[in-house]
């Protein structure tokens, strides 16, 4: 019954996160010391960040495949766009890796990209990695989202500092009831707070969904406008790709993602 109610309440137009321009809706400014693994992606011609990502070690960043762009610049150790941290660093990609050696992905599968930096970054107060998941999150888990994405939608208001919010892992059937066009199974996580407007928005794409101190998800896509009527968001399920991630980082660049 609950699923049917949600389906009736949440009549939405689908859009990839990059199309709906997501930032954290309903959140507050992150503490400057709580996100040393959070990176910002943009191009020199962009006036705001295009996407976010997660630092896995000194040379590797995890983000969404749909965040790929030409002339990408990667900022690490950043908090306030207007006031750089002393240990802030900038890098560019040396190599990019996708599941199928190309940018083939869907709303429910393979929206994941690994970036090898052109040179390692030193760890510091504001630069440190986040661990890959040791197990998938369970329904009901409280998880953390963060990013420089829009704090309002559809009239986007982009902040100078990252915003953070807590959301819950929901049963996949909730997202299926909300969006209608999803397959019976997918390598994604459904997360949000039903009937509350808290979630990711423009600019948050590629950033982490953090559960128990591990990166469990990658911001992939959501409703348009963001979190419309409390609609949940979809996140790439990192646990399903851990073998591929470790293989690529370990030097097996021909590794393929799970089918």
Swiss-Prot record:
Annotated protein name in UniProt: Snake venom serine protease rhinocerase 5
InterPro entries hit by this protein: Peptidase_S1_PA, Peptidase_S1_PA_chymotrypsin, Peptidase_S1A, Trypsin_dom, TRYPSIN_HIS, TRYPSIN_SER
GO cellular component labels: extracellular region; secretory granule
Signal peptide range: 1-17
Cysteines paired by S-S bonds: 30-164, 51-67, 99-257, 143-211, 175-190, 201-226
Chain positions listed as propeptide in the UniProt record: 18-23
Function comment: Snake venom serine protease that may act in the hemostasis system of the prey.
UniProt feature coiled coil, ranges: none
């Amino acid at each position: 019954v609950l699923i049917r109610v949600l389906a009736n309440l949440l009549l939405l137009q689908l859009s990839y996160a990059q199309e709906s321009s997501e930032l954290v809706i309903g959140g507050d400014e992150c503490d400057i010391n709580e996100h040393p693994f959070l990176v910002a992606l943009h191009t020199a011609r962009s006036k705001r960040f295009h996407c976010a990502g997660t630092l896995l070690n000194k040379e590797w960043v995890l983000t969404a495949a749909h965040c790929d762009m030409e002339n990408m610049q990667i900022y690490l150790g950043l908090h306030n766009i207007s006031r750089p941290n002393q240990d802030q660093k900038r890098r560019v990609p040396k190599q990019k890796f996708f599941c199928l050696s190309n940018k083939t992905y869907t709303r429910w599968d393979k929206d994941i990209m690994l970036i090898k930096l052109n040179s390692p970054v030193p760890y510091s107060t504001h630069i440190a990695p986040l661990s890959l998941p040791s197990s998938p999150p369970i329904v009901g888990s409280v998880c953390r989202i963060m990013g420089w994405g829009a704090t309002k939608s559809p009239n986007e208001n982009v902040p100078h500092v990252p915003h953070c919010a807590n959301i819950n892992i929901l049963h996949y059937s909730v997202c299926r009831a909300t969006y209608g066009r999803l397959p019976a199974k997918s390598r994604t996580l459904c997360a949000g707070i039903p009937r509350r407007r808290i979630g990711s928005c423009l600019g948050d794409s590629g950033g982490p969904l953090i559960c128990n101190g591990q990166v469990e998800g990658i911001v992939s896509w959501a409703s348009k406008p963001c979190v419309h009527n409390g609609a949940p968001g979809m996140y790439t399920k990192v646990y399903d790709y851990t073998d591929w991630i470790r293989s690529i980082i370990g030097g097996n660049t021909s590794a393929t993602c799970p089918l």
